[in-house]
C-alpha cells in the first residue's frame, strides 16, 4: 500500500517505524519545518524527519499544508492512504479526500474523552 505519513514529534516515530516494518511503501513523509535551536541557531530535524531520512524516505516540510502548492505536491504521490499522528497543522479537505482509502488520524489517547492538545 502506498502511504504518506504525516507527523512530527518523538511519539509519532513508533507509528512510522511500524508502518515501514509491516512492508508498506511509504512514498513520502510530511513533517513540520526544521527549527533553529541553541545559540548557534543550527537547524534541528524533527524526530519523524530523522526516522524518514534514516530509512531513505523523501521528506516534505511545508510551512502551511493548506497552501495550494502543498496540496498539489502531495497529489503527485497517488497515495492509497494518509496516516497522520501529531502533525501539528489542520489538514485541508482537499488532502483528506485525496487518497483512495482516505486519511487516518492516530491519537495517543481515547477520543473524545481525552481530547486536548496535551493528551499524554
Can you say where each PLM-predicted feature lies in the sequence?
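One-carbon transfer enzymes
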Residues: 1-118
Amino acid at each position: 500500500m502506498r502511504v504518506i505519513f504525516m507527523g512530527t514529534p518523538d511519539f509519532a516515530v513508533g507509528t512510522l517505524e511500524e508502518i515501514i516494518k509491516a512492508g508498506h511503501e511509504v512514498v513520502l513523509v510530511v513533517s513540520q519545518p526544521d527549527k533553529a535551536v541553541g545559540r548557534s541557531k543550527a537547524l534541528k530535524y524533527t524526530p519523524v524527519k530523522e526516522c524518514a531520512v534514516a530509512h531513505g524516505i523523501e521528506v516534505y516540510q511545508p510551512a502551511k499544508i493548506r497552501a495550494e502548492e502543498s496540496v498539489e505536491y502531495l497529489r503527485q504521490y497517488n497515495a492509497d492512504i494518509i496516516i497522520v499522528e501529531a502533525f501539528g497543522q489542520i489538514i485541508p479537505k482537499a488532502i483528506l479526500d485525496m487518497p483512495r482509502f482516505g486519511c487516518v488520524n492516530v491519537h495517543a489517547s481515547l477520543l473524545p474523552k481525552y481530547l486536548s492538545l496535551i493528551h499524554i
